[in-house]
């Protein structure tokens, strides 16, 4: 791709500085990256606003010969004075990260155009729902891919990206590889961070699915309205040249608000709304136990379908119902979906049950790390009627601090005992995090244990379990690491529980 062709395609990008003796017609562009370490000579280094004061450092380290920055005469002029004159500087009026996805897609020939992409957004349930959809489609012979918190899956490949929604350049490369391997349908998680930062700009999305919206990420979003608008962004980037549709849980927190906003903005968009005001898709007759979950899903025309699944918890009633509606939207067979839901593979770190050797005690490992998710998982474990429920949790450091006391109140109210421990403390002092959590307990409430060492806390929690008791280990789920300071260490809640039970 010639530089001149790129500038014609993106008139919002202007040529700021060009080395003397060179012709823009002769400059070849291979790709665009926002990670300076990934750049090659003929790449564009996209200098995101979030880099802040380190722009000069990252530009110096980048191998890229082209640099894209936001228009700022002071910053650009300072850089032009000190940078190697062989660099080509491009400028734009907005955060370059918002253009990165469109440029990446353009340079790769728009790989997402040839894929059916179903994107799921929401505070809780994204990973479960995308994994359920992946299983349903795969069982019906569809070559499908999965992108999300647990990683990227397609064919026999599993890739850990480290992000729920990969950066725009990585995402487009993944989609290109999927297309080349014959993948036709992709189920992906769309995080609020990814949507707000423009990681999905330029991606052709056929369907948007919304699970719920409750408090989280207020360290990143200015308030809940900003968080909501970031989620709504998914429906603004739908590709209406495809058979586009939306799926949402009308009765979920902020579900009705989103429904009416979509309806006002896109009145012709097909919406499958679970438990909406017209009761077209109504859930009833819910049955929950440790053997599985069942319910009746009402369909249009006064029809009903009994849904049974091995997935546990009341939240999986909503997840499987949303998956069923999404499956209808993409043309999956109803009977085959019903059969597949009975035997969905265990989703790592989501209501994952581990029994002691004699099965007299159990632990549940779950990713719940928000107030709403913690309440849902505790209530779901309660449905199994354990003789004693001990909830072990912490809160991530350098993240939304306002949820800490809220999670304490929920744990105290719904559990028999509470253990406070570290999650990913990052650069905060673990004891300070526990202090802030503890402010949410009622006067006089004393947790069973307060231990910053998560492994020790799990061992103590297991040792305190009576026969018929359950330890809920919440917060990290599938994660196989713990971040202490700036160091990422191997750590797995599942492994620690298994060791505490003497299973290996």
UniProtKB/Swiss-Prot annotation:
Pathway: Cell wall biogenesis; peptidoglycan biosynthesis. Keywords: ATP-binding, Cell cycle, Cell division, Cell shape, Cell wall biogenesis/degradation, Cytoplasm, Ligase, Magnesium, Nucleotide-binding, Peptidoglycan synthesis. PANTHER family: MUR LIGASE FAMILY MEMBER, UDP-N-ACETYLMURAMOYL-L-ALANYL-D-GLUTAMATE--2,6-DIAMINOPIMELATE LIGASE MURE HOMOLOG, CHLOROPLASTIC. One of its GO terms (molecular function) is ATP binding. Its main location: cytoplasm. InterPro entries: Mur-like_cat_sf, Mur_ligase_C, Mur_ligase_C_dom_sf, Mur_ligase_cen, UDP-N-AcMur-Glu-dNH2Pim_ligase. Belongs to the MurCDEF family. MurE subfamily. Catalyzes the addition of meso-diaminopimelic acid to the nucleotide precursor UDP-N-acetylmuramoyl-L-alanyl-D-glutamate (UMAG) in the biosynthesis of bacterial cell-wall peptidoglycan. It catalyses: UDP-N-acetyl-alpha-D-muramoyl-L-alanyl-D-glutamate + meso-2,6-diaminopimelate + ATP = UDP-N-acetyl-alpha-D-muramoyl-L-alanyl-gamma-D-glutamyl-meso-2,6-diaminopimelate + ADP + phosphate + H(+). NCBIfam families: murE, PRK00139.1-4. A motif (Meso-diaminopimelate recognition motif) lies at residues 423-426. Its EC number is 6.3.2.13. Carboxylation is probably crucial for Mg(2+) binding and, consequently, for the gamma-phosphate positioning of ATP. One of its GO terms (cellular component) is cytoplasm. This is UDP-N-acetylmuramoyl-L-alanyl-D-glutamate--2,6-diaminopimelate ligase. Meso-2,6-diaminopimelate binds at residues 399, 423-426, 475, 479. ATP binds at residues 122-128.
